[in-house]
């Protein structure tokens, strides 16, 4: 289980990682790559790098890239050292955040005068979870929607909608390299809503066949616990593992349902969930 937990966390952190990889059809005169060794199979997605994003709210603010196809004797120059600083160590290019948010271009030159340009973006990183569909409230037992009471349950909770299509959660991490540290939260209930501030925490649910992500969101005097359901557990538009986009978030609201509808008796084993479909992506944001 510990191994599965680490693998899952690693998969999730891949969604937060620095933007590095690109696809190339042919070898360039000078190229950059991530990792220790170049994988340059023509016509495939390799570890070539066409641009870099460095998050200033990360414990790791330096990127170490390999240099391929050059002639040695490298020199590097940043168009704005306040955004990104550069250094050369043999055939490696070191990029370090300069402390200023923005974009810069790194120019690398070899001893033969060949050049390569690398766009770099630095800034505060966040994860945006944007709701694309409000599935709504569903009664579920053993992963199956209970169709016989579906409409009555939905009617009873018709006003429950903490997040709707077009809305989003913006998660500003304390450390983009360590999601478990949590961070600051901005909630936009819909596309026109103003931001409501709060905090979020991240953990893994150790139930079922594999650990699953859980976000505890606290804002506006309320706490909402969103989980990614076990793959195949709930049939919606998106069956999701951790790294599939879009995917489903679910919130167990059985307690709220019973409190608000004391005369409604749920069948044994049935729980009530609020579901949304979301797309996630990394963002560079302006801190207000």
Whereabouts are the PLM-identified features?
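Bacterial N-terminal signal peptides that target proteins for export
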Residues: 1-10
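N-terminal start-of-domain structural block
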Residues: 2-3, 23-25
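Repetitive helical segments and hydrophobic/amphipathic motifs
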Residues: 12-14
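C-terminal motif of bacterial Sec signal peptides marking the signal peptidase cleavage site
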Residues: 18-22
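Extracytoplasmic soluble-region selector
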Residues: 24-287
């Amino acid at each position: 289980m510990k191994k599965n937990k680490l693998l899952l966390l690693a998969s999730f952190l891949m969604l937060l990682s620095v933007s590095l990889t690109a696809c190339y059809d042919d070898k360039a005169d000078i190229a950059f790559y991530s990792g220790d060794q170049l994988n340059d199979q023509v016509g495939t997605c390799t570890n070539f790098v066409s641009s870099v994003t460095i998050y200033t709210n990360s414990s790791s603010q330096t990127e170490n890239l390999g240099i391929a196809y050059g002639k040695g004797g490298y020199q590097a120059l940043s168009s704005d050292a306040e955004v990104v600083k550069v250094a050369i160590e043999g055939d490696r290019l070191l990029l370090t955040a300069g402390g200023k948010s923005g974009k810069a271009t790194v120019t690398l030159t070899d001893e033969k005068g060949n050049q390569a340009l690398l766009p770099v973006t630095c800034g505060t990183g966040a994860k945006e979870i944007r709701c694309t569909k409000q599935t709504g409230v569903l009664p579920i037992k053993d992963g199956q929607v209970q169709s016989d009471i579906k409409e009555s349950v939905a009617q009873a909770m018709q006003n429950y909608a903490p997040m709707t299509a077009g809305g989003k959660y913006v998660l500003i991490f304390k450390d983009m390299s360590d999601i478990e540290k949590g961070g600051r939260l901005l909630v936009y209930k819909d596309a026109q809503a103003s931001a409501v501030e709060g905090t979020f925490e991240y953990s893994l649910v150790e139930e079922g066949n594999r650990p699953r992500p859980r976000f505890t969101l606290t804002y506006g005097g309320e706490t909402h616990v969103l989980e990614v359901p076990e793959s195949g557990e709930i049939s919606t538009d998106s069956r999701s593992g951790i790294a599939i986009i879009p995917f489903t978030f679910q919130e167990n609201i059985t307690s709220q349902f019973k409190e608000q509808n004391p005369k409604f008796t749920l069948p044994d084993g049935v729980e009530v969930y609020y579901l949304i479909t979301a797309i996630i992506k990394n963002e560079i944001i302006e801190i207000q």
